[in-house]
Amino acid sequence: MMHVKHIALGSRLLPLSFACNPSEVVHVVGPNGSGKSTLLGAISGTLTQREGVSGQVLVDSNDLLTMPLSEQAHIRGYLCQQSRPTFNVDVFQYLALSLPTGANISDAKVRDAVNIVIELVQLQDKLHRSIQTLSGGEWQRVRLAGVCLQVWRTINPYSQLLILDEPAAPLDIAQEGLLYQLINAVAAQGIGVLVANHDLNRTLRYADKVLLLNNGVLHSLGHADEVLTEEGLAEVFQTQVRKVVLEDRPYLIFD
């Protein structure tokens, strides 16, 4: 279990606390500039005390933020918003760089994990392509495969947490479906998943817990039905919101 205690970064993110249980999918939502990326960067340890981060991220009573990044990488995977490296390697070489180090794992387990992940994101025909020739959506699927392999339990028994910052942004509708299948597959291994997300209808459907941020402040926290209310969303996003039910499933409609 992960306990975030009083995490903050100046005026960009005021102190907030919450927990993420094993297998729980937690979505962080809010308008642009509300502090979503700041929160995820602080929890991941890539934003540090030098940048003004305070608070604790406790995983099994150990503070993630006091560990070297090399040790953090065994416990959590972090995917920031889209970037493409300047170096040029094939997809399979990039995925090899993403594999966890230090664990005593067999080649067969690595092969099995890689095969499962690349099938989930449909990369089977892209393994020998240069990452520099991929479309934005293809590259994002490669990045998702890499970070999920970093925490995949059969090859990294120490993993506890997967952090994804706006992972659906470069994906089309069909590829978004693959993303949520991948998230479910990771969560099913007992790993908590923390996702910054803009598609509130996906959050309403897939999130176990939701944090709604506004101007660096935690507006509300709880189950999706409790947080994604017409009144709360209208207040935070400054737009009219209606919640409707179609075929027994709730949807949000924005003006």
UniProtKB/Swiss-Prot annotation:
Record key words, sorted: ATP-binding, Cell inner membrane, Cell membrane, Membrane, Nucleotide-binding, Translocase, Transport
Any one GO CC term of the record: plasma membrane
Record's bilayer topology term: Peripheral membrane protein
PROSITE patterns associated with the record: ABC_TRANSPORTER_2 (PS50893)
InterPro entries, per the entry: AAA+_ATPase (IPR003593), ABC_transporter-like_ATP-bd (IPR003439), ABC_transptr_BtuD (IPR023693), Metal_Ion_Import_ABC (IPR050153), P-loop_NTPase (IPR027417)
GO molecular-function term, one example from the UniProt record: ABC-type vitamin B12 transporter activity
Disulfide topology: none
EC id: 7.6.2.8
Positions bound to ATP: G30, P31, N32, G33, S34, G35, K36, S37
Cited Gene3D superfamilies: P-loop containing nucleotide triphosphate hydrolases
Family matches, as HAMAP family: BtuD
Binding partners and assembly: The complex is composed of two ATP-binding proteins (BtuD), two transmembrane proteins (BtuC) and a solute-binding protein (BtuF).
Protein name: Vitamin B12 import ATP-binding protein BtuD
Organism in which the protein naturally occurs: Vibrio campbellii (strain ATCC BAA-1116)
